[in-house]
Amino acid sequence: MKKRLYLVIENYNRELESRIYLAIRAAELGWSVVIGNKANIVKQIKNLHSGVFFIKSIGPKNAEIINLLKEYGNKIVAIDEENIVFFGDNHLLTRMDHNCLSQLDSFYCWGQREFEYLERLYPKFKNKFFITGNPRIDILKAPLNKKYIKE
């Protein structure tokens, strides 16, 4: 059976195009991909094959969902969609719940600055941080950006 990737969407206007891009890239690498909103995926968790869940944030509101996904044998990777701007340690501490971070398999950083900042703030979890960029930015670059040049 193919590896399964679940791309969880909370805000279709902001996330759909970048998730489609990720789905295409993952499919090219042999993954089976499911795109859906968080509520529907959670409702169906008992019926889904275990896989890798890509989520957009790990704030305290996501603790229950992350626990549920882990109970069913899934891996969880995350990116913070709003973390492009830093507002200091206190702000980041509200966006990244320590318990959620402890259950993550990987956290994807937009760049070196975020990576170093998180390593300093959460040294215990430094092996979970990876610099990947953000697919929302990737689709704005050539050759994928033709749609956005007109806008």
Where does each model-flagged region fall?
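Active-site and donor-binding regions of nucleotide-sugar-utilizing enzymes
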Residues: 3-149
